[in-house]
Amino acid sequence: MERVLDFVGEYNLNKSIYNEFADKINYILNTDADRIIFDFHECKWFHASLTSVLGGMISICNKNNKNVILDIANGSAVADFFNRAGLFSEHFNYKPKEKKNA
């Protein structure tokens, strides 16, 4: 069974965003789904400091035997950010562009 967690809007550093992440983590811990899709299609901005929180969420999923997919629109600002930073590519729903200077 799979469940989708939506990431909608702008993810800046503020209390409401951290509360949203806490709610998502609680949901992950309490669902019996074995596949969790993090849907970033409606995400317009994702602060770099939140990548550690996202990584923690992925780690929690892995430790609870839940497969994670990052559903990100190829070419979106969020996908480009994660790709440039080399983050989470093993979880992308598409193959990230190869780095030209690597």
Question: Where do the PLM segments sit?
Answer:
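Bergerat-fold GHKL ATPase/HATPase_c domain
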Residues: 1-35, 42-55, 59-102
